């Protein structure tokens, strides 16, 4: 069927945690009495639904790093590939907004195994298959994504190597990627379910904002969106 025509017919979304789909914004404020080692001051999502149903996602992250007794070197996020809602991740890019530096692609490496971190690996990002604990493997989006009929899942890690840092009150990064296989096409509609961050997330986030744009022809009158959350949070449009 024509994906673009179906998208115009209807786009529905069930979002777990903190995102309102559409062209409006949603703000979430979370508070905690415990000062964590790592926290996100803000997390802003810019999401574009492509004509083929894929999602182009950019995260604008402002993080705080407290002194934990040893340097920070590697930041990362993990994603689960499933045949029914996320089959691949490609087009990854990472920019250090604070220092106006675009990171280059590298490979996963354990910081504990590196003598001169700043000279050898700082300023690089990586994507790895971490499905097997303690055995990260290279991941190539062109060949290693899931097929639509796959019965097995994969866990991907997208990470970026920062210069050795004892602490930082504010570090800003833009992390972008394209998520494939997130939409389901029916006879007259296309739907997708997206979870910006899951129930296993352990990083406190001070404020989350999300903006989603759709292809031309999708309007408030021919699309629907739902927000689901179990968090005790303040939500505003």
What is each residue range found by the language model?
Residues 2-232, 236:
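Lumenal/extracellular ectodomains and adaptor appendage modules
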